Amino acid sequence: MMQSLSNVNFFQDGHFVFRNQFFFKGKAPSVSDSVFVIPGLVDVHVHLREPGFSYKETVKTGTAAAAAGGYTAVCSMPNLAPVPDTYENLKVQLDVIRRDAAIQVLPFGSITRGELGETLSDMEAMAPYVAGFSDDGKGVQSEKMMLEAMKLAKSLGKVISAHCEDNSLLHGGYIHAGRYAAAHGHKGISAESEWGPIARDLDLAAKTGCAYHVCHVSTAKSVDLIRQAKKSGVDVTCETGPHYLLLCDEDLQEDGRFKMNPPLRSPEDRDALVEGLQDGTVDMVATDHAPHSAEEKSRGLAGSLMGVVGLECAFPVLYTGLVETGKLSLEALVERMSLAPARRFGIDNQDCYAIFDLNAQEIIDPERFQSMGRATPFAGWNVHAAHVGTIYRGELLEKGRNA
């Protein structure tokens, strides 16, 4: 049955136009006048944890969380069991997606077998079914291995999406090697452990012509390297997360919900990421939604597993923290959270929309999340842009908590 919303601000051709009515299928949500209808959000970096770790999250709960945050397409990372390094292993995940996903899910195949960095995965067999290839959770340590992966990905027309981390520079660190780590006796992770591999890979991407994407950029030097590579014609894009744009190591608390990889960096790094988002060096925002069990996140900064959740609060926190403060236009936020990721990874997002009430206020409450994960550094934040509904392929999926 067709329904409609009246008096909406509709995103069209890069700007907002006023529409008297907006039609869709499903039960109409209860909303105020002048809500904003934007293209469905797209997240190219999500951990759905299934198969292998369904005590943390499932495809069903993860995509429900995505829909509750306005997302209509996500790309799932390959650190699973089995690792999708052959078509047979990938099919295990594809079958679950077909059965349980509420929205579009495009998985990544792994770059190397078992994400061990030793031999290439069966990329040819997986190519028709994946968004690209990544060893996310681990960096490809071997330059030779990454070179071979890029050559093969180039021939297949696929993106290499790289988790950039030099294991030789970690030294057991788990938060940023900055003032907080020094003051509180924590082991730090250097910025070079990220930007070093990025510099290496940018050279390889220039040589091979491979479409190269950098995951979860967190340092100022990384942004500068990518900016210069773009100017020289390298086919590179990158993402950063909401937490890197809005928080830094000065915001750390002795709580597992502040622990992720890469870690929250310095204020200068945060500011450089915002500048990169403004000038287009940082192409897109991805949450790196990485749920863990409550027990796994209850061991403080030193003992908790790395990873936070973000699908259900990303748009409100970024709207409040960047748009309302004048750092980014609403149109640019839509570009970074929907259009750019869909364009880079060839994602069909037609007839998919997210509806937000920009004036509605809410407090981020993880206990109300659809996700099985609860660990977010944004818990308790007072934000605007409450989610009203998500329309997937023309039909309303999720009304939102204020409907």
Predicted ranges, named:
Residues 1-30, 35:
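N-terminal metal-binding scaffold of metallo-dependent hydrolase/deaminase domains
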Residues 8, 21, 34, 45, ...:
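Divalent metal-coordination and catalytic microenvironments
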Residues 8, 300-303, 351-403:
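C-terminal cap of metal-dependent C-N hydrolases
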Residues 95-111:
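A glycine-rich helix N-cap at a beta->alpha junction
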Residues 35-100:
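Metal-associated gating/positioning segment near the N- to mid-region
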Residues 183-209, 278-279, 283-285, 290-356:
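His/Asp/Glu-enriched, well-ordered alpha-helical/loop segment
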Residues 120-285:
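Histidine/acidic residue-rich metal-binding segments in metalloenzymes
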Residues 44-57, 78-80, 106-119, 137, ...:
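Active-site mouth loops of central-metabolism enzymes
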